Structures are given as C-alpha cells and as structure tokens.
Amino acid sequence: EKIKDWFNSEQVEICGGLFNDHPEMVGPLTSRIWNLKKGRETLLNLVGKEVKVFAKTTQGLSADTPRVLHLAGFSKALLMPHGENNIPTFRGPVFSWSSSIGRQIETFCREPFSSSTNHTFFHLAFHLGKLLQQDSSHTLAFFKTTSNSSIFYNYLLKANSLAPIFGNWLTMSNYLHEVYPSEYPGPISQD
C-alpha cells in the first residue's frame, strides 16, 4: 500500500514490463510481445498506474528489441549493466535506439555509480568534473544494490532535501521526457 502511494505521488517509478524474464531471443515475435503486454497489464493491476519505461533485470537483449518494445507500446527504455557486460557508451546519457522497421526508442544508457560504497563519493569531484567537461546533459545516476547505502549517499539526499544542490531528482520517465537523445545510431544488424 505504501509503495502504491509513492508510485501515485510521482516520487517513485517502476520500470519493467516483462511478465516472464527469460532470454529475449527465445520464442516467436508474438510471444515476446504478449510477454511485455501481460507484464504491463499485471503491473497496472498491482499498482494502479501504467509502466512507461521498459527495464530488464537480466541480460539478453537483441537487435530486434526496439521493434518488440514499440509493438508492445513502449517508447522509452533503461539499459543497465549486468555483471561483466557493459552498456554502450555515448556522449550523452540518452540515445535513440532504432529498430529495423524505423521506430525509435529513447534509451537511457549511463552506467550508474554504486550508492552502497564510499569509493563512489570519495571520487565524486572527479566524476562531476568529467561530466561537466564531456557530457552533453550533465547526469549522475546512482544504483542501489544492497539495502545499506553509503553514509555519504545519505548525506547527499539529506542536503538535497534542504536545497537542490545537485539539481532536480527525477523519475526515469520525467527525465526521458526532459532530456533529448544526443545520438541516433542506426539499427543494429541481426548478426
């Protein structure tokens, strides 16, 4: 019930969409689209609000993913690194992921910093300097992997609640609505 309240007040956003999380390339196109639509419908029934941003907790994306997402009703996605696998690196945090049928999905692809380790915050000045010099849209992303956060992350949240020292904290759909894609790579081949 508390999560529903957070979700409805725009403080928290659920990114997802899959009903069964299995490798993306398994099964025919209609089954993959059904899986996404059923996942969105299930989340809508659970929290009372539609999921706008696709995200996946395991690896297994294919070159056909943007097409499948578009056919299932998604226009935005979140790419997260999984273990040893890296995500594409672009000049900006958002790129337009093209499909073989010409449809595009706005995709966030910035590798997040861990909010659980003090190491992240020890090097925060370096990360900020790099962002200000090289990034087309200055964005810091944090990823919480454990229930315990670094004490510095908690200080950062507390300081930001007093004054917006690091700018605005946005949900992913609001962020993708405000930030324009910096690059438009062509469709990835099926090879």
Task: Give residue ranges: language-model regions.
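Catalytic-domain carbohydrate-binding cleft regions of carbohydrate-active enzymes
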Residues: E1-D191
